[in-house]
Amino acid sequence: MARLLFRLLQEANSTSPAEASPPFNSDLVLILAVLLCALTCIIGLIAVSRCAWLRRIASRNRSDQTHPPPVAAANKGLKKKVLRSLPKLTYSPDSPPAEKLVECAICLTEFAAGDELRVLPQCGHGFHVSCIDTWLGSHSSCPSCRQILVVTRCHKCGGLPGSSSSGPEPDTRIKQREDGPDNLP
């Protein structure tokens, strides 16, 4: 094998100048080939990234039209079924659970006799039904104390507790609140 290479080199050196091709620099050819490959790769990457960018914009436009943007879970609000399950009561200034309820912290209006109130079970704060329903539609916490509102399901049936205005739950929570902050559940 070495002899064959040696003979080829001798024949290449012994060729006449008239028959020899014009000299060229092999380093220049190698540099041009590398640059051509790099240019092809760069153009390919640009094409792929542009396609990905256009697909992302198209999917974002489609999702904006069909779905609202995602919101953090804490500020998502409560479902209407859960809102309806929260207890209501009719305000009467002389009734025991309503003695500490003076005004709605949302609209800042004093409660009048006959106003329909919703008392939050976790903290015992009371608000006008329309005010608190609007608030809880976009928030899941009490507007006064910011306590997260958690409605527990019935252990027997798995459903939400009924919304009765005469249930013991709101009265008990309000009475505990009247006794002092140390007695809160």
From Swiss-Prot:
Disulfide bridge partners, by residue number: none
Q: Where in the cell is it found?
A: Membrane
What the entry lists under PROSITE patterns is as follows: ZF_RING_2 (PS50089)
Please list the GO biological process terms of this entry. protein ubiquitination
Note the InterPro entries from the entry: RING-type_E3_ligase_ATL, Znf_RING, Znf_RING/FYVE/PHD
Q: Which GO terms describe its molecular function?
A: transferase activity; zinc ion binding
Q: Tell me what topology the record assigns in the membrane.
A: Single-pass membrane protein
- ZnF regions (RING-type) run across 104-146
The pathway where this protein functions is: Protein modification; protein ubiquitination
Region spans: Disordered: 161-185
Sorted UniProt keywords = Membrane, Metal-binding, Transferase, Transmembrane, Transmembrane helix, Ubl conjugation pathway, Zinc, Zinc-finger
Ranges of Basic and acidic residues composition bias in the record: 170-185
What Gene Ontology cellular component terms go with this record? membrane
Q: A Pfam family in this protein?
A: zf-RING_2
SUPFAM superfamilies in alphabetical order: RING/U-box (SSF57850)
Note the Gene3D superfamilies from the entry: Zinc/RING finger domain, C3HC4 (zinc finger) (3.30.40.10)
What is the superkingdom listed in this entry's lineage? Eukaryota
Q: Which residues cross the membrane?
A: 28-48
| UniProt domain comment | The RING-type zinc finger domain mediates binding to an E2 ubiquitin-conjugating enzyme.
User: What is the name attached to this protein's record?
Assistant: RING-H2 finger protein ATL8
Organism equals Arabidopsis thaliana (Mouse-ear cress)
Gene encoding it?
ATL8
